[in-house]
Amino acid sequence: MSDTDLNATRRDVLKSGAVAAVGLSGGGLLSTLQEADDSDTAGDAVTSFLGEDQVVKTACSPNCRGKCPLDVFVRDGQIKKVEQQVPAAKTFKRGCTLGMTHLQRVYNADRLKYPMKRTSWSPDDPQPDQRGADAQFERIAWDDALDLVADGIQRAKREYGPRSLLWHSGSGDGGITGYRRLKELVGGLQDDFTYGIDTNVGQGFNRVTGEGGVFMPPTNTADDWVNAETIIIWGSDIFASQFQMDAEWILDAKRNGAKLVVVDPVYTNTAEKADLWLPIKPGKDTHLALAMMQYIFEHDHYDEAFLRSRTNAPALVRADDGTLLDPASVTATPPEDGIVVFNTETGSPEVVPAETNGPFALFGEWTIDGTTVHTGLTALREQASSYPPQAVADTAGLAAADIETAADWLATRGPGGIMPSYGVGRYLYGHVFGQTYATLLALTGDYGRHGNIHAQHPSYDGSYLETGDWNDPDGAAGVDTYGYNRVLDLLANGDPVQTKFMYGMNSNMLGNQFPERDRWLDAMSNLDTVVWADIYHTPTTRQADIILPAAHWFETEDLLTTYTHPNLSYRTKAHDPLWEARDDYYIMAGLAQRLGHGDKFPDDKHDVLDRFVKNDDRLSWDALRETGTVATDETPTVAYTDEFGTESGRITVYDDDAPVEEGPALPDDGVSLEVPKPLEARTADDWAHADEYPLLFMQKHSKWRIHSQWANVPWLREINTEPQLDIHPKDATRRGIDDGEYVRVHNDRGSVVVRAKYNDGIQPGLVNTDQGWWARDFVDGHLQDLISAETAKVGRTFAFYDCRVEVTRAADEHQSNEYTQHNPRGSSGTATDGDSS
């Protein structure tokens, strides 16, 4: 069966969406009407176009954190247009271009229509080598598909044990589904990006403060940012990727007099708004933060009261072994959270609990009962002294005066903060930056005050929905969790268990964000059965044995929450799923019925949502249906007003129980992280292969996609037509590369062919190709073939930016433009131009 049978062809889309598919092929309304005019429906289409709409209140649901409310205009059962819904609350007013293009996501030529089975697959003879771009599929009935999936689950458990099942879900849908409930009931393993993707910064911050998890830490709510006097945006292009939520608050702060510093190697939309742009060399972020600390120490700009009362800066450290002095050596009954400090008034040590201020020495060295001790802050100051701005300026590619200005603004202007995002942690040892900036903010006392900022993601705890035991039902078998960094070995080597069955959803994992893609493809060949549920036929579904067509967000009812604004949205169904697509909830319910858990899933998903709404006093169906969005908490919140979550209740300026990081370019015995220490792998100037691969390679986020979602939307492809390599003209001309030529980007792991684009806003020595493109979008190779899947011992996070490459002009055969009508080669949008239905 061909892909034109597997996917929604252009003619199919037009039949299902009529003129709702306006512009699907990039031709606009008139061409759409002309294409539809192969029957007597053209007149009806025009009449429908001029009719009246029903406005359905729903919401966008990707992993951008927005969950923006949308008005969907429906006529004759078809979506005609999408507009931004405008709630009354200022905290939630902006949508983006992506949300306005959902028409072309619902009525898209890549839509999966029916359940499919790979023709060369059977339970007894899976033939995994037949998976891939050339795999052929045949249509099967839903009952047959669910029977095959359920039988595969039971067979794997029977022959290899319950942990032979692997459940995978990405972040492609922010709604509440039955996925987690089913996997808990059935058991097995689940992979989880808690370790593996974008977790470095949060890990480092958490280790110092005891707060947050492994992603971005808690911070003041966005509506409090207006009180900031200095905002440092570190490694994030908020004004391109998060403007609908975060940008307005930063602009409000600037209008109120705040200084905006942007640390980014690329001149971004956000850098353009800065009072001070620091175009740092990639991988030098910890160097810069330590230089700022050195300046603050040298000029006595640190917050003494905060350091004494809310950090372990005055804690006494043994010089012989680096451990904190034991409180029991000073008093017989020390408080649980006590630290030993030196009281300058009494001239003796004493033990004090958290949140205690007093005449405690911040610096100094003493001998107590024959043991030489110094304060934790003394050790930190000694470490920072090796990184004065004048020395770091050359290392980081910055002006020393600019480093000093940034440090001075942060330390002296009043409350402020540092707003990192995930990009700054996309290096092998990126967690050290998390430790470093958390410590830097402790020096300036920027915790627990109005105007403090600690992350790009504001924290609205009240926006969560209480789901009770829905995701942890009674009698559940439970699942074991493996971070993405361990799943590759799990699949490749069967360590620690043989994995034979995989169910995936909400994810295009093999198209985006899984480095060393070929290793993943090889590892998945050890699976007997791969099942994937998706809206579209993606690079990942092409590796499946059974494909289940999922419904678009506008075809399902759901509730949406997010921790980054104080609102909850109700996703109303605009129309039923097209063709035989199904809401993931009903797919899970169908499997549950076959696996003996049917009684755990109500027949109607609305009954589940009704249970959640009735259990939450803030919500009512009347309000949800009328407005689509309900504000759950609009009170500005200041984070870190209570004791910190560390053992001492204080920020750990000096960590005597620090982990030892091990990995490339580090000593054989590793590096202990009592205080921040700049660690680098491939970004280091003296990296072993730096001469062979002299260019650092980033893959930043694009404002035209959320990961790989929206990569197949024709309207957006008219603007962002194909992958390109941002390269500084100096680097290009040195290699004989003209602007617009196709180039081969390569290293010892792989290569990709893309079009070169001169960009003066990217510094020499650095190149970039935005992430999120599908495999078919590249002329040859793949972006993720270049990235190492190696992770460090402590960080355990994929280091997408820790990558070096060389760039050469591509072969002559690749120099012709292979993109037609804004569609990539091989896409359904192009391949079905002349199809028959």
Swiss-Prot record:
One of its GO terms (cellular component) is plasma membrane. It catalyses: dimethyl sulfide + a menaquinone + H2O = dimethyl sulfoxide + a menaquinol. Keywords: 4Fe-4S, Cell membrane, Iron, Iron-sulfur, Membrane, Metal-binding, Molybdenum, Oxidoreductase, Signal. Binds 1 molybdenum-bis(molybdopterin guanine dinucleotide) (Mo-bis-MGD) cofactor per subunit. Binds 1 [4Fe-4S] cluster. Induction: By anaerobic conditions. Its expression is under the control of DmsR. Residues 1-36 form the signal peptide. It is a peripheral membrane protein. Disruption phenotype: Cells lacking this gene fail to grow under anaerobic conditions using either DMSO or TMAO as terminal electron acceptors. It comes from the Archaea. This is Putative dimethyl sulfoxide reductase catalytic subunit A. It comes from Halobacterium salinarum (strain ATCC 700922 / JCM 11081 / NRC-1) (Halobacterium halobium). The lineage of its organism: Archaea, Methanobacteriati, Methanobacteriota, Stenosarchaea group, Halobacteria.
